[in-house]
Design a protein with these regions (language model features):
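PLP-dependent amino-acid enzyme catalytic core
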Residues: 1-211, 215
Length: 218
């Protein structure tokens, strides 16, 4: 199977997986003077209110299986050394940390999340609700990432699952990006089901953690 198909197959093995709605907004498209406008509604993705679980889940699965492209979550669980279970570490300002913590809970792993100043109480509670150990800092996101690096270095068995890269740390961020291909694959299939060819489209992430697809032609 193609990489995107392997990613989608894995996501389909996760509890609560379902294709999220693609909603057409014809009146808004007319107001904007474009052919067609679609909103990919990620507000109910796996009951986590954001698409970030797609990237975090695949990155965690790949990290735990040494990049074996696991077919399902059972294969990931089987790869975990019960005597040396790793701790998942991440810095976050919201949904990424919750997604990493959710995967840790699903896999029976400990999780430590570093949260910078300015994150809402609701977001913090959501992450804590997934069972993560929370560290709040009086600093910005970059400082949170640095502390997450330090925490990872102090532990014998830890995996830093960060959605940004730096020299020497590229593989996990790349896996996170691969995870998002499921969203694109779903959208492609949903557009095909409309029965009309979309010759060109633009993808825009908007604040409510959805993706907007706009096509210049009908």
């Amino acid at each position: 199977p193609s990489p995107a198909k392997e990613v989608a197959r894995f996501h389909q093995s996760l509890p609560n997986y379902a294709i999220t709605p693609l909603i057409e907004l014809p009146e808004v498209a007319r107001e904007l003077g474009i052919g067609r406008l679609f909103v990919k509604d990620e507000s109910a993705r796996m009951n986590l209110s954001a698409f970030k679980i797609l990237g975090a889940a695949w990155a965690v699965a790949q990290a735990l299986t040494d990049g074996a492209n696991p077919a399902d979550i059972a294969e990931v669980k089987a790869a975990i050394d019960s005597e040396n279970k790793p701790t998942l570490i991440a810095a976050t300002d919201g949904n990424h940390g919750r997604a990493v913590a959710h995967m840790a809970k699903r896999l029976g792993l400990e999780c430590a999340i570093v949260i910078p100043d300015g994150v809402s109480e609701q977001a913090i509670n959501n992450i804590a609700g997934e069972g993560a150990e929370i560290t709040l800092i009086d600093g910005d996101y970059d400082e949170a990432v640095e502390l997450a690096k330090e925490i990872t270095a102090t532990l014998d068995h830890a995996i830093h699952v960060q959605d940004m890269s730096w020299p020497g740390y590229e593989q996990i961020p790349n896996w996170i990006i691969e995870g998002y291909t499921t969203l694109c694959a779903e959208t492609d299939e949903q557009l095909r089901e409309l029965g009309k060819h979309i010759s060109r489209c633009t993808v825009v992430e908007i604040e409510e953690h959805t993706s907007e697809l706009q096509s210049p032609e009908a």
